[in-house]
Amino acid sequence: MRRLRDYSLCLCLLLLWPLAVNADDSWRQIQTEAHGQTVWFNAWGGDPTVNRYLAWVSEEVKRYYAIDLRIVPVADAADAVKRIQTEAQAGRRQGGSVDLLWINGENFRTLKQANLLLTGWAESLPNWRYVDLQKPVREDFSVATEGAESPWGSAQLTFIARRGQTPQPPTSPQALLAFARAHPGSVTYPRPPDFTGTALLEQLLIALTDQPAALRQPPQPATFAAVTAPLWRYLDALHPALWRAGKDFPASPARMDAMLNQGTLRLSLTFNPLHARQKAASGELPTDSYSFGFTAGTLGNVHFVTIPANARAVAGAKVVANFLLSPEAQLRKADAAVWGDPSVLDPQRLPDGQRQALAAALPQDLPPVLAEPHAA
């Protein structure tokens, strides 16, 4: 029996060996094609920390792969999406202006539905083998990615407070309402359509609605009012206790950080669980700043890069996406002194030294991750 098992194992290895060889050959061909290419990477440029990290990525892919990575800072990925749509309408099926795009779920759905994205490539990247498959890396805002996006960071809606000011933070919507009423004018959220402000509203809707399953599907006109009614009632109660009585809102989480630092606010918001640590280390937030979330869970997601179907430098874009998934790049990105963006890799899939380093860099004691509502 043992001899039969050994024979079966050898046969399986022999059958799989050509597949591994072909995959290696295919990737080497992609790297060869990428050599010397210019890759235009459209990415959110609203944080100097992120910009410095991407500048480092540009240096590394130049050094290792002879790729000229040009970062195109955008205020909103929707601007790049409109450009891709305009090129498609003009019949520009090749040689597009965007090779790689940092994209959110709503814009991903828009491009995917219009068949404007390259599909089926992400899980063929060599560094995909390190990805934590327990994270939502195969869907984006409840839309299946189908290999059209490669993950490169994870995020979770997180509150920030100061221990000297708020030793016991609110950890539920009801506690947040009571906290705001107890400290009028010291709580707020970024004005939608700011991503973080919108995420807080989605977080509250998930926690308050009595029809949570409906949020995993596109909104239905017949049920929308009933599904969302608890949120509107809650906001009607919350807004009078907010900063400026809920008649005005900060433009961004960065503005909330500044107001927390000044003592105007007691809470700030971020989508990065390591943000408080990173900003305290840089002196942009007080040293007693800490992160927390709702006990029942907070909204979480993965951020992705995608390749338009009409990209000029497809091979180069794949090589850059693969580098973004490398343990080296992910460890550097997770370092609070660099960016502090949580990794999408599974430490258990890494070699010993990198495994320990990544495990130490991951956020600790996070609340459960709640799936985002459907992108529609």
Which sequence ranges carry the predicted segments?
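Extracytoplasmic/periplasmic substrate-binding proteins
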Residues: 243-308, 349-350
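Bacterial N-terminal signal peptides that target proteins for export
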Residues: 1-9
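Bacterial N-terminal signal peptides
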Residues: 8-18
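Mature extracytoplasmic/periplasmic domains
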Residues: 298-299, 303-372
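Short, polar/charged alpha-helical segment
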Residues: 27-35, 42, 47-68, 159
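Sec/Tat signal peptide C-region and signal peptidase I cleavage site
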Residues: 19-23
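Extracytoplasmic ligand-binding site segments that recognize negatively charged/polar headgroups
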Residues: 44-56, 72-79, 94, 98-254
